Amino acid sequence: MKEQSRKNDRVEILGIELEWKLRRHDTVDQYCVLAATMPPGAGVPAHQHPQQEAFFILEGQAEFAVENGAGLAWKEVNPGDVVNIPPDVIHGFRNESDRDVKLLLTCEAGLGRFFEEAGTPLTENQSARANVSGEEIQRVLEIAKKHGQRFPAPA
């Protein structure tokens, strides 16, 4: 079995910690697998991108919104639930509980490129910050746009 790359295993994006399990170069540039920890109050606003992704909820209770033709409605998800996001579908997620949410994320390699560029490396003793500055949000949004992501105006 080939040893996977372990360089910068953990990064933070918008207060969410991502730990690489498989990088795109480990899968012949096909897909990525990441473990995510989303602390209370963290989340990603409604957005869309050309890559498919899927979330498997491991621990905690999160809220996901996925466009369904009638709009965007938030739905509670729990351990064992899977949320599949087809390409170009508007979606968002958040943790409004008082406990961390842990999930497994599988995505196409193109989305992995975004995570590689936008992620801020975490040292062994660091964890994701609870509060994200406006400057950091703007930095991530600019990188997201460069990678084909769109953030529709709230309805």
Show the residue positions of the predicted features.
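Short acidic-glycine-tyrosine-enriched beta hairpin
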Residues: 26, 54, 69-87
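A short, N-terminal "cap"/entry segment at the start of jelly-roll beta-barrel domains
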Residues: 1-31, 127-155
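Glycine- and acidic-residue-biased ligand/ion/polar-headgroup-sensing regions
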Residues: 51-63, 67-68
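A hydrophobic, small-residue-rich beta->alpha segment in the mid-to-C-terminal subdomain
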Residues: 113-127
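Ligand-binding loop in jelly-roll beta-barrel domains
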Residues: 79, 87-112
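Histidine-centered catalytic micro-motifs
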Residues: 45-52, 89
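Conserved short histidine dyad/triad with adjacent acidic residue
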Residues: 17-20, 34-48
